Amino acid sequence: MTGTGEANGVAPAADNRNVFFFDIDNCLYPKSYKIHDHMSVLIDDYFQTHLGLSREDATMLHQRYYKDYGLAIEGLVRHHKVDPLEYNDKVDDALPLDDIIKPNPQLRKLLEDLDRKNFKPWLFTNAYINHAKRVIRLLGIEDLFEGVTYCDYAAPKLLCKPDPDMFAKAMREAGISDVSKCYYIDDSALNCIGGKAYGWKNTVHLVEPESKAPSQPACDHQISNLEELRTIFPEVFKSA
């Protein structure tokens, strides 16, 4: 990443550009990579081993915490005093990403075509910084973002999307104060609902063709492929 780098918790010097916030997992790479499935197995393993649960109970509690808090780790920290960095080592950092994620020239071209004079590309993820950096490095796009707002597992209180404070944190770190200048894409309906509720009207829900769309739209824009951003937000891209 260039410019402000991680910027976690630190507000950079403000500029007048809009900011385009990109989610990472199942957004910058497709769900067909099944990284979420790999992660779910590792999370269930962690619940089973560290909480002494049966596999069925581990899966149920994992899903409950994910639904209640947006991240399984938040439930573990709140209710079981788990060390989130140790959890990260056993789950996120243990994923075989090098065997799954490869450079994506089409994605790189899309990001290169952003009008950087008017738009600042920024990563916005519920993952820890280690995972975020691994993914964008393997995709071959680490030089195309100016910073990342992530869930800081080392912080006293875990903060993640769709908590409104997480959107406030992203704006602070990206150096922007006007919600009308925030563009955002995520594959999570809950996160898109949270973004729109926070005032990010230019929020886009990415729903791949093989995924089930929500019965009620999560926000004003829904696409099935990142390339569709060129059509719904032509102002974001450089003129031909």
Features from the language model and the residues they span:
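Electropositive, surface-exposed helix/loop patches at the edges of structured domains
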Residues: 95-98, 120-123, 186
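A generic secondary-structure micro-motif detector
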Residues: 33, 62-63, 100, 122-125, ...
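Short, flexible active-site loop motifs that bind/organize anionic cofactors or intermediates
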Residues: 48, 77, 97, 122, ...
